[in-house]
């Protein structure tokens, strides 16, 4: 098994002393090179986890470790070298006058030599398919393009962990598709631990593992295919599986054998082709 890169140990958090607990005794691990999805309805605590992982917040109870380092006020800058984040609003993340300047910004703050910076700018923009927009100003980019630049800016500082906190929530369908294609490509090629935080179950189909939060507690953990079989239980906590899972059930209910649990329309077509070839 791969090495643990993140440990949440009995973590509880609330935003003020008299307020409700946003997270309650939450424990989980994340491993090197793993894609973990964290899902839940609005207010379930998932975005709070993202902020705790990056040292933007600290737990009132429990402990968090990133690559063996305890997250606290003394380690915050070491932690942020290891953890990169992309948030919901692409307009709030652009700090440079051009795409090139934005990707360079984090590296400049770390004193990375200019030749290395230039190489990383080229590599990361190619990784997110934005190499043709090097000198483009941010207002000329779509929301999806801005988010891809935000991902490149994080990759340029070479984190061990990349967190996408509802990174597609403010995008149109085209932008969402662009980002998920980018995420799939990065996970295949970059060799880092990826954490995607979302309420949209269509975005978790490629994840290795899924943690489900409900009212601040860890409600379930499963692979995507296992989770999609629990449609009724998910619906009770305000979540719904992708249309392809409902479609698969409809075929089964009409006597068509679907042996596996398809996670995409392409996989469903393969199942139907297999069924047809056996007739």
From Swiss-Prot:
It comes from the Bacteria. Residues 6-240 form the ABC transporter domain. GO terms for cellular component: ATP-binding cassette (ABC) transporter complex. Keywords: ATP-binding, Cell membrane, Membrane, Nucleotide-binding, Translocase, Transport. It is a peripheral membrane protein. Gene3D superfamilies: P-loop containing nucleotide triphosphate hydrolases. ATP binds at residues 40-47. One of its GO terms (molecular function) is ATP binding. Its EC number is 7.-.-.-. It is found in: Cell membrane. Belongs to the ABC transporter superfamily. Energy-coupling factor EcfA family. Forms a stable energy-coupling factor (ECF) transporter complex composed of 2 membrane-embedded substrate-binding proteins (S component), 2 ATP-binding proteins (A component) and 2 transmembrane proteins (T component). ATP-binding (A) component of a common energy-coupling factor (ECF) ABC-transporter complex. Unlike classic ABC transporters this ECF transporter provides the energy necessary to transport a number of different substrates. This is Energy-coupling factor transporter ATP-binding protein EcfA1. It comes from Oceanobacillus iheyensis (strain DSM 14371 / CIP 107618 / JCM 11309 / KCTC 3954 / HTE831).
């Amino acid at each position: 098994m791969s090495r643990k890169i993140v440990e949440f140990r009995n973590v509880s958090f609330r935003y003020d002393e008299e307020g409700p607990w946003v997270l309650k005794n939450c424990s989980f691990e994340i491993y090197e090179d793993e894609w973990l999805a964290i899902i839940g309805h609005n207010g379930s605590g998932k975005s709070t986890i993202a902020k705790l992982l990056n040292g933007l917040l600290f737990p009132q109870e429990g402990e968090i470790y990133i690559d063996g380092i305890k997250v606290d006020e003394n380690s915050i800058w070491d932690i942020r070298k290891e953890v990169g984040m992309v948030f919901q609003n692409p307009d709030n993340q652009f700090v440079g006058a051009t795409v090139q300047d934005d990707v360079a910004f984090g590296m400049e703050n770390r004193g990375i030599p200019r030749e290395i910076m230039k190489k990383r700018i080229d590599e990361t923009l190619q990784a997110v398919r934005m190499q043709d927009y090097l000198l483009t100003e941010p207002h000329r980019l779509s929301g999806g393009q801005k988010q891809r630049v935000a991902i490149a800016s994080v990759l340029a500082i070479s984190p061990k962990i990349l967190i996408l906190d509802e990174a597609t929530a403010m995008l149109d369908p085209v932008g969402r598709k662009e980002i998920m294609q980018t995420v799939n490509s990065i996970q295949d090629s970059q060799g880092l631990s990826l954490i995607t935080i979302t309420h949209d179950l269509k975005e978790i189909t490629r994840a290795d593992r899924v943690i489900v939060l409900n009212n601040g507690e860890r409600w379930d953990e499963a692979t995507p295919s296992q989770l999609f079989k629990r449609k009724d239980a998910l619906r009770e906590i305000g979540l719904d599986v992708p249309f392809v899972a409902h479609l698969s059930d409809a075929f089964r209910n009409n006597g068509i054998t679907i042996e596996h649990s398809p996670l995409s329309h392409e996989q469903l077509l393969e199942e139907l082709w297999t069924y047809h070839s056996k007739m």
